[in-house]
Design a protein with these regions (language model features):
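Membrane-proximal cytoplasmic juxtamembrane segment of single-pass receptors
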Residues: 3-129, 134-144, 149-181, 226-230, ...
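C-terminal lobe substrate-recognition/regulatory segment of protein kinase catalytic domains
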Residues: 73, 289-330
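Protein kinase catalytic-loop region centered on the HRD/HxD motif
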Residues: 181-194
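Activation segment
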Residues: 247-253
């Protein structure tokens, strides 16, 4: 009996020592990450500002940044979304940022803010918007992003006459491939994997070279590598949501694939997913396109500005969009497969359902 108690005591001590060592290791790894990635972290007016390492921030101090931020007004607004308002922050003639202000309203909103930081902190990819830092206070939170000079894909395709511009086919293809690569990186290469949950043309921003950058992780859900879904509140935008959202309330990577398929249709048709003409008829872009396909009148789908573009490239992209828009999620490709198929278009290979 005494021998058994001794063994149990020994095992308990070993378990406690193991747990403590894991905690210490986690703290050390976090401090190492922080030393490597954080330029400064300091209090300011009851809040805290954290900036990550970046060449563009070498000479910028938190005092200058926050003084400029506190002067933002409605005239600086460049966009708004479900999680907050976006402002243009001009530091000087050559340095500017996009600042998203998130109002602190509920505990859920705070959790969303922390989730966004966790998702964005270490992500570095040419097709994903860069998070430079954040400011957290009892009253509001600020996310500080790189500013994209060409705005959003939505503005180019559907903006007012002074904003919208004609995009040629090579540019549309480049945007589609870049956005696909960014989403695929979130799905397959980030640990934990990330489901965006709000893929749409207004969340695809364009840099000075018209390269796509996937933005707005305020609605991002982190997915453990061994999980296939996350059961949380449904977030997204009408016209882009996969049909299974309304049945199950589950966010999945295949839901993002569906939303990306809608973006491909926008690029091909030039139409908004919830165009007024569709709403008047009680339908939407996806339903309209599928109806036209069933009637074998695909030529009526394309944006008129694409009439002289390479037919094979257009048709292959259209086929990829339809694969992404399969009603059954299991029949949709993964984003990695979508990237591969889009890359095949320029190589001259025929796109087939994988």
């Amino acid at each position: 009996m005494a021998n058994d108690l001794g063994i149990a005591f020994y095992i308990t001590i070993c378990c406690i020592a193991f747990i403590i060592s894991k905690i210490i290791l986690t703290i050390l790894l976090y401090k190492r990450w922080k030393q490597k990635n954080v330029i400064y972290e300091e209090g300011f007016s009851g809040g805290k500002v954290v900036m990550f390492r970046s060449p563009v921030l070498q000479s910028l101090t938190s005092d200058v940044l926050l003084k400029k931020t506190l002067k933002l007004s409605n005239k600086d607004i460049i966009g708004a979304g479900g999680y907050g308002t976006v402002y243009r922050l001009m530091i000087n003639d050559t340095l500017a940022f996009a600042v998203k202000r998130l109002n602190r309203g509920t505990a859920d909103r705070d959790k969303g803010f922390e989730r966004e930081l966790e998702a964005m902190g270490d992500i570095k990819h040419r097709n994903i918007i860069t998070l430079h830092g954040y400011y957290s206070s009892p009253h509001y939170n600020l996310l500080i992003y790189e500013l994209m000079p060409n705005g959003s894909l939505d503005a180019f395709l559907h903006g007012k006459s002074m904003e919208s511009k004609i995009l040629d086919w090579p540019t549309r293809y480049k945007i589609a491939l870049g956005a696909a690569r960014g989403i695929a990186y979130l799905h397959h290469d980030c640990i934990p994997h990330i489901i965006h949950r709000d893929i749409k043309s207004s969340n695809i921003l364009l840099d000075q070279n018209m390269e796509a950058r996937v933005s707005d992780f305020g609605l991002a859900t982190l997915m453990e590598p061994d999980k296939t879904h996350v059961s949380t509140f449904v977030a997204g935008t009408f016209g882009y949501l996969a049909p299974e959202y309304f049945d199950t309330g589950r966010a999945t990577g295949k839901g993002d694939v569906y939303s990306f398929g809608v973006v491909l249709l926008e690029l091909l048709t030039g139409k908004k997913p919830t165009d007024e003409a569709f709403l008047e008829e009680g339908t939407k872009l996806v339903t309209w396109v599928k109806g036209v396909v069933e009637e074998r009148r695909e030529e009526y789908v394309l944006d008129s500005s694409l009439s002289s573009c390479p037919v094979d490239e257009i048709n292959n992209t259209f086929n990829i969009a339809l694969m992404c828009l399969e009603t059954d999620p299991s029949k949709r490709p993964t984003m990695a497969e979508v990237v591969k198929m889009l890359e095949q278009i320029k190589s001259g290979s025929a796109v087939t359902d994988s």
